[in-house]
A protein has these predicted regions:
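NTP-dependent small-molecule kinase module
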Residues: 2-8, 29, 33, 144-176
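Hydrophobic anchor at the beta1->P-loop junction of P-loop NTPases
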Residues: 15
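P-loop (Walker A) phosphate-binding loop of NTP-binding proteins
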Residues: 18
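ATP-binding Walker
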Residues: 21
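Walker A/P-loop
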Residues: 24
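ATP-dependent small-molecule kinase phosphotransfer cores
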Residues: 41-90, 95-100, 146
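Short glycine-rich anion-binding loops that position phosphate/pyrophosphate groups of nucleotides
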Residues: 88-91, 113-115, 159
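A glycine- and Lys/Arg-enriched "phosphate-lid" helix/loop adjacent to the NTP-binding pocket
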Residues: 104-145
Length: 176
């Protein structure tokens, strides 16, 4: 393991990108490789609310959900040790959030082709804000500029293991 990566124990690695970009899968594999705890903000919210993300959106609305995301991020930022964090796709879009994440660690944008991401999640019924491919592309286009402000951008069109290797390589080259 690269010496730089071993020094990440006090820094968070935030994985951002569209739903379907592989944040959870890549995050879990990456956490095993570099021996840091893994957190998925959507899973944390579902657990604390006792509802799926889709149910939260449909019963309480997007604004309420975004407030839960901010609270979840605050809890993560208060942690004393580094973690791999799979962020909900809209979390970095919230005003000030990207800056907070960059101060607390490294933000990695998992850049996947919108059509590939859409196809990965099309069969899942628990995803909010997902309609036809055109609306998915519009959502992607509305978020891409913010995503590009990440510290690191990695192509996420390959297999999970290929993407993990790309992320690890990028982390070893990142200037702290």
């Amino acid at each position: 393991m690269n010496r730089k990566i071993l020094h990440l124990n006090n820094s968070h690695i935030f994985l951002i990108g569209m739903m379907g970009s592989g944040k959870t899968t890549i995050g879990q594999l990456l956490a095993k490789k570099i021996m840091l705890p893994f957190i998925d903000t959507d899973a944390m919210i579902e657990h604390s609310e006792g509802l799926s993300i889709q149910e939260i959106f449909s019963t309480k609305g997007e604004e309420y959900f975004r407030s839960l995301e901010v609270k979840c991020l605050e809890n993560i930022l208060n942690s004393k040790s580094g973690q791999i964090v799979a962020c909900g796709g809209g979390l970095p879009i919230i005003s000030g959030v990207m800056e907070q994440m960059k101060r607390a660690g490294i933000v990695v944008f998992l850049a996947s082709d919108p059509e590939l991401a859409y196809n990965r999640i099309q069969a899942q019924s628990n995803r909010p804000l997902l309609g036809q491919i055109e609306s998915f592309r519009q959502l992607y286009n509305s978020r891409i500029q913010t995503y590009k402000n990440a510290n690191i951008t990695c192509a996420a069109n390959g297999t999970p293991n290929e993407v993990v290797l790309l992320v690890l390589n990028a982390l070893t080259q990142f200037e702290f």
